[in-house]
């Protein structure tokens, strides 16, 4: 019976092209079915590990690790940039962030000649404005582009500091190991913006007193205007600019009551942490991981296993838990193809970055070979914004 169910589920989606799956990244990672991973690599201040598992028909999670100069000037400062972009409504916004966020950060770092919270904030703003310009240009012919958005988590290691900026519900968790006891302690550095959090609902209600329905409990899930769970994001322009909440936008996306100021924000919450010797690593992941494990569970897994392949291990544990919740075997879950797989778990992206205390202490002038890695999956062609893409078109584009 279970075998028949697997065959039915696999038949619901078009065949996956292995060439298409591998074409999304040339960063040295490996592909096993819907799982992409880079078991190990080196950044300016230590080691890293990355993994991505796809659940959606088109991968909505995007991610990158950039290490080397954090400025458009070769003189530095030097450091490591990590980005996890969890898209919703399609992959267009997260793909756009992946292509532009780091370049904006380098530009503003060059202008200020240093890394700072203000630099990161400006990079978020410039990325948001860039995507807004695309929506403006395409709205009449592709109105649904206004409904696509992405959470955005950025971590920057530079000059002995760890900057964590977040808009949405991805999460960055610091692993600290106490030298006396050897115990690992999890510290969440990112603030989350999800309507399921009471403080977020209170913030929204205070910002929008004229909208009694600013947060609505719908099917036991709190949502902004009954539509979206996150209160901060890049994109989602139809909930930020009223001129994009009208025809030709589909009626199901249009609000009944007008609004004069943005209902969602793109401004990140930023934390700056001075790295200490007991700070051993940071886990940056989309909410697909955190749905299946706690901060402490994730930190314990990293602490108690080899660094090589640790991101893949975290993803595997999350998938095993997802299978357990559905009373099925992990081996059977892996047989379910993208698209249908989304009924069992979300896209999951995990990047684990380790800190070498000796390297961190040498500061932002530490030079090293430039490193640029992007997570992979079955994706839209580069620089293509096509919300109307059909499965047949997507397969054809990936094969070309």
Curated annotation (Swiss-Prot):
Mn(2+) 2 binds at residues 86, 287, 346. Its cofactor is Mg(2+); Mn(2+). Mn(2+) 1 binds at residues 86-87. Gene3D superfamilies: PPM-type phosphatase domain. Residues 47-355 form the PPM-type phosphatase domain. Pfam families: PP2C. SMART domains: PP2Cc. Disruption phenotype: Slight increase in hypocotyl length. Plants missing PP2C42/PP2C-D2, PP2C64/PP2C-D5, PP2C79/PP2C-D7, PP2C63/PP2C-D8 and PP2C68/PP2C-D9 exhibit an increased hypocotyl length, as well as an enhanced sensitivity to LiCl and media acidification. It catalyses: O-phospho-L-seryl-[protein] + H2O = L-seryl-[protein] + phosphate; O-phospho-L-threonyl-[protein] + H2O = L-threonyl-[protein] + phosphate. InterPro entries: PP2C (IPR015655), PP2C_BS (IPR000222), PPM-type-like_dom_sf (IPR036457), PPM-type_phosphatase-like_dom (IPR001932). Binds 2 magnesium or manganese ions per subunit. Its EC number is 3.1.3.16. The modification Phosphoserine is found at residue 75. Belongs to the PP2C family. Interacts with SAUR19. Dephosphorylates and represses plasma membrane H(+)-ATPases (PM H(+)-ATPases, e.g. AHA1 and AHA2), thus influencing negatively plant growth and fitness. This is Probable protein phosphatase 2C 64. It comes from Arabidopsis thaliana. The gene is PP2C64.
């Amino acid at each position: 019976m279970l075998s028949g169910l697997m065959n039915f589920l696999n038949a619901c989606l078009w065949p996956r092209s292995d060439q298409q799956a591998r074409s999304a990244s040339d960063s040295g990672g490996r592909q096993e079915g819907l799982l992409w991973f880079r078991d190990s690599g080196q950044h300016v201040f230590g080691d890293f590990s990355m993994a991505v598992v796809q659940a959606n028909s088109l991968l909505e999670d995007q991610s990158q690790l950039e290490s080397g100069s954090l400025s458009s000037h070769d003189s530095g400062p030097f450091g490591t940039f990590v980005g996890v972009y969890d898209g919703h409504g399609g992959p267009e916004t997260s793909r756009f962030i992946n292509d532009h966020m780091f370049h904006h950060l380098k530009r503003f770092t060059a202008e200020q000649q240093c890394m700072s919270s203000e630099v990161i904030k400006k990079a978020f703003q410039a990325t948001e404005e860039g995507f807004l310009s695309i929506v403006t240009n395409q709205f009449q012919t592709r109105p649904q582009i206004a409904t696509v958005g992405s959470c955005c988590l950025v971590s920057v290691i530079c000059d002995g500091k760890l900057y964590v900026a977040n808009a949405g519900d991805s999460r960055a968790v610091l692993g600290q190991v106490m030298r006396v006891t050897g115990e690992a302690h999890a510290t969440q550095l990112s603030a989350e913006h999800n309507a399921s959090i009471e403080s977020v609902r209170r913030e929204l209600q205070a910002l929008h007193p004229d909208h009694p329905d600013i947060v609505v409990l719908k099917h036991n899930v709190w949502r902004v205007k009954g539509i979206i769970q996150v209160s901060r994001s890049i994109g989602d322009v139809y909930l930020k600019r009223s001129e994009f909440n009208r025809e030709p936008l589909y009626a199901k996306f249009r609000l009944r009551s007008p609004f004069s100021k943005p209902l969602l924000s793109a401004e990140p919450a930023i934390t700056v942490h001075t790295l200490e010797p007991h700070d051993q690593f940071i886990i940056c992941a989309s909410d697909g991981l955190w749905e299946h494990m706690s901060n402490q569970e994730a930190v314990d897994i990293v602490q108690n296993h080899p660094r090589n392949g640790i991101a893949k291990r975290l993803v595997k544990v999350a998938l095993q838990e997802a299978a357990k919740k559905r009373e099925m075997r992990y081996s059977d879950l892996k047989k379910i193809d993208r698209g249908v797989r989304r009924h069992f778990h979300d896209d999951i992206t995990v990047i684990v970055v380790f800190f070498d205390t000796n390297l961190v202490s040498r500061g932002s002038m530490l030079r090293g070979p430039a490193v640029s890695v992007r997570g992979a999956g079955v994706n839209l062609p580069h620089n293509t914004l096509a919300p109307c893409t059909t499965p047949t078109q997507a397969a054809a584009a990936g094969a070309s």
